[in-house]
UniProtKB/Swiss-Prot annotation:
First-listed, main subcellular location of the protein, grouped into a coarse class: cytoplasm
Keyword Metal-binding (UniProt): no
Top-level class of the enzyme under EC nomenclature: transferase
Pfam family, one: FA_synthesis
Name recorded for this polypeptide: Phosphate acyltransferase
Length: 370
């Protein structure tokens, strides 16, 4: 894999300065035109970005030719196959070679690109990522990390896992804490992230056995891994300023994520109905327009689009399948930021640290038992 040294990051053909992002142009609900539009939007804001884009060559050449910001900054890899949202991960593992998703990950595996971005099928993308990139040594279960709007200065919190695996034992939760803290530090500049473990209450006697075990394990690595452990947190803390990283299993995290998305949609619909009921309410909406736009920007799901697959030998960012150009651009921006920070090598170091720490703890317990 590429070194964390920015001077040795993969470069696009013909360019000595750009960080390369591998992009799957197919698989999203809106088609390759939206993905290319998102690439152009991101390229206009980030002069140092270059792309290897995967999909039908003739179609991509036509779409890219219309975007001046992409001139000379793309290398197209022809891939006729497409992984659809209906494809099962098991089928993709057997027959996925030749698809744009497979080709996208292959560019990262071969060291041609630093990170991959795809709007495609989440289950298939995770399965192919584990097959082609492999798990980091010491990682039992990779995790998907998402961003949650919050009261923190950065505007959001990191939560993982949100659906990679419905199970997680104490060691998995410790690994998630280390990976989540590394992600928050390298992706968003938080020098010492605050990590919390999601539970049904903050009292130490509450929760399943694996949560209680993780509650004991996580503080043992916090100092060396440069994060603060705040203990158990509840659902109400997800958008709070008490914590920066929320650790949970994939089942709980996915339910929380989908509940949050549904609630945000409901609030938006109710506000729209309330401000449209009468002439006076429409006038009130006009007076509050500035504040409403600031609120909309703060909680706009497009702005925080991009779930990061953590625990693999490569950085993979999963964009929402229904993302528009702005959402795709946000996912690419996130991948670019992580690539620039040398995130992958730092993450590998943190995971290795967790394995060593767990070994020391287990060794101490065995000595005490004997």
């Amino acid at each position: 894999m590429a070194s964390a040294d920015s001077n040795t990051l993969p470069r696009a053909p013909g360019d000595g300065d750009g960080v390369v992002i591998s992009v799957d142009a197919m698989g999203g609900d809106r088609g390759p035109a939206t993905v290319v539009a998102g690439m152009a939007e991101s390229a206009g804001k980030n002069p140092g970005i270059r792309f290897i884009v995967h999909g039908p060559q003739a179609e991509l050449e036509r779409l890219i030719a219309r975007r001046g910001d992409l001139a000379g900054r793309c290398d197209i890899r022809d891939a006729a196959g497409v992984v659809t949202m209906d494809d099962k991960p098991s089928q993709v593992l057997r027959k996925g070679e030749g698809t744009s998703m497979w080709s996208t990950l292959e560019s990262v595996r071969q060291g041609e690109a630093t990170a991959a971005v795809s709007c495609g099928n989440t289950g298939a993308l995770m399965a192919l990522s584990m097959l082609r990139l492999r798990k980091l040594p010491g990682v039992n279960r990779p995790a998907i990390a998402c961003l949650w709007p919050s009261r923190n200065p950065q505007g959001f919190n990191v939560m993982l896992d949100v659906g990679a695996d419905i199970r997680a034992d104490a060691q998995d939760l410790l690994t998630y804490a280390l990976m989540g803290a590394s992600y928050a530090r390298n992706g968003f500049g938080l020098e010492r992230p605050r990590v919390g473990l999601l539970n049904v209450g903050t009292e130490e006697h509450k929760g399943r056995p694996e949560l209680k075990q993780a509650h004991e394990l996580i503080p043992t690595t916090a100092q060396a891994a440069n994060f603060d452990y705040v203990g158990f947190v509840e659902g109400g803390d997800l958008p709070s300023a008490r914590v920066d990283v929320i650790v949970t299993d994939g089942f709980t995290g996915n339910v929380a994520l989908k509940t949050g998305e549904g609630t945000a949609k409901l609030v938006g619909e109710l506000l729209k109905e309330a401000f449209g009921k009468s002439v006076m309410s429409k006038f009130a909406a006009l007076l509050a327009m500035g504040s409403l736009k600031r609120l909309q920007k703060r909680i706009d799901p497009r702005r925080i689009n991009g779930g990061v697959f953590l625990g693999l030998n490569g950085t993979v960012v999963k964009s929402h399948g229904s993302a528009d150009a702005t959402g795709v651009s946000a996912a690419i921006k996130l991948a670019f930021r992580l690539a620039q920070s040398g995130f992958q090598d730092r993450l590998a170091a943190r995971v290795a640290q967790s394995v060593a720490a767990a070994g020391q703890i287990n060794g101490s317990k065995e000595s005490e038992a004997s």
